[in-house]
């Protein structure tokens, strides 16, 4: 059984915004609609998405590289390091992406580290409407180190 640890999210969240090309307009409209709420938080985004959000809203955005150029992996690393609290990722389920493995890895990391994740506008709307969005919150994160050690030992014995 894995142990859990508590990770505190402050009232001012670190929110990362990502959108595939066909969903960038949808995300920008969502950000504009929620601008009064989002201005109370710190925004991050992958390259092109961040540029569009910043230009379209005048909200400050810390930008990573473009998704296909490693931005999704940068975001995943920041999630694993506990530096990002919320993922808003409007992805296109009907359009194959050249960096699909990176997208899958990012979503896996978001689940593994138990960060709130919205992949469509309805979920993002519910998220920002939640009272938890505006208060500090402690999320539970499983400690997988024991399971990893057990796996590595079993692999060593199998050799």
Go through each PLM region and give its residues.
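Short hydrophobic/aromatic-enriched beta-strand-loop microsegments
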Residues: 42-43, 59-70, 138-141
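Short active-site oxyanion
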Residues: 15, 36-43, 112-115
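Short, glycine-/small-residue-rich phosphate/pyrophosphate-handling segment
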Residues: 122-155
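General beta-strand structural signal in soluble alpha/beta enzymes
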Residues: 44-46, 63-65, 89, 117-121
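Mid-chain, well-packed structural core segment of small domains
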Residues: 72-112
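Short, acidic/small-residue loops that bind anionic groups at enzyme active sites
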Residues: 106-127
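Short internal beta-strands
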Residues: 40-49, 53
